[in-house]
Structures are given as structure tokens and as C-alpha cells.
Swiss-Prot record:
Part of the 50S ribosomal subunit. This is Large ribosomal subunit protein uL1. Keywords: Repressor, Ribonucleoprotein, Ribosomal protein, RNA-binding, rRNA-binding, Translation regulation, tRNA-binding. InterPro entries: Ribosom_uL1_bac-type, Ribosomal_uL1, Ribosomal_uL1-like, Ribosomal_uL1/biogenesis, Ribosomal_uL1_3-a/b-sand, Ribosomal_uL1_CS.
Amino acid sequence: MPKRSKRYLEARKLVDRTKAYTIDEAIELLKQMPSAKFDESIELHIKTGIEPSKSDQQVRGTISLPHGTGKNVKVLVFTRGEKVEEAKAAGADFVGSDELIQQIQKGWTDFDVAIATPDMMREIGRLGRILGPRGLMPSPKAGTVTTDVAEAVKAFKAGRVEIKNDKTGNLHFPIGKKSFDSEKLKENLVSALEQISKMKPAAAKGRFIVKVVVAPTMGPGIKLDHQKVVE
């Protein structure tokens, strides 16, 4: 077990691990925790009731946070022709086709979101082994395979977050920064839970959202009483 920092241990003393906190209480606790040397992300960790081994019970999509994530999202667009200028005008950080594919094949992945026009997907397929494990492979379900590259670029820059369950059926994603004021964090958190609650796969049975924990990047988790928000 890794040795915890003094700051982490001090933060953990503030949290009653037997209690489920209201959203307001949880955000107040987050604000009371000792700060790291950088502006930590605030992350949601959601345990779901899906069976992740079944292909018809995968959670994949996007949510939009009213106040964004606070992160400068680097967006890459695979496209050609007139769409190149559309993507650049919308604020994409990297735009192109063959040259980007070659860079990625050499190991470069210095971006957060990859968007592609449908005509590029056959060529991008060869990047699956590199982009797939990193959650960067463009997908129609995630809204990252589209002809409207300008809208997609703007949306991800503004705070759209891609959602995908891990191998254990859990979801992990940022909802803001610790520097956000409490009201903005609350609005992002509530909005995220409301949107996630509508993403239950049709084949999934029983409760969808089983447990919700909110935590700073370098701090302990705080269990939320999420029932009033999602049920």
C-alpha cells in the first residue's frame, strides 16, 4: 500500500467514511481540505449496476457541464479538405490526416480528445491499439465521429466530457477544479448526475447508479447521498 502524504492524511480526518454526505456538505468538505501545490481537479467516481462483460450493457456517451471542467482541453481533428479550416476556426489544436496518423504511430498522444469525420475512420482504424487503451479512439456514441467538426470542437472545448465505463463497470470523470466557487461545483455535479442517470443501458437490470464518490485529484473520496438527485 503506498504511503500517504501528510496533507492527504489531514484531509482524510475531515471525512466520516461511514456517512453519505449531501452535495452541499461534500463541497464544503472539499473546500476545507488542505490544498495541493496545483489547482486540483474535482472528480466523480460512480459505481454502476451494469455487467461490464456484456456488450449490450456498456455506458458510452458524453455529458455537458454548465461551467466546463476548468481544463484546457487539447482537441485533435482527423479530416481533409474544407473541414480542415472549419476545425481550425472552431479552435482545434491539431488538424490533419496522414501526418497526424504517422505521428501517433510513432507514439505521440499529446491531446485529450480526438474527433474524426466519417471518411477518415478506415485509416484511423490502424491506430486502435494506441488510441483505444487511452480512451482517445473516435466513436459515434461519444460524438467524436461527425461531419459537424466545428460544433464538436466547440463543445469539447467548452466542457463536454466523454463518459465510458471501465472494466469493472465504474465511471470516472472530472467535474471542475478546486478553485471553482462552491455554487459552480454544485451545478456541475448535479448536472452530471442528472445526465448520467439517463444513460442506463436498456439491457441493464436493477439500480443503475449504486454509489457516488467525489474527490480531489490528490485527496480522499467523499461518499454522496445521491438518491434525491437521480431518483
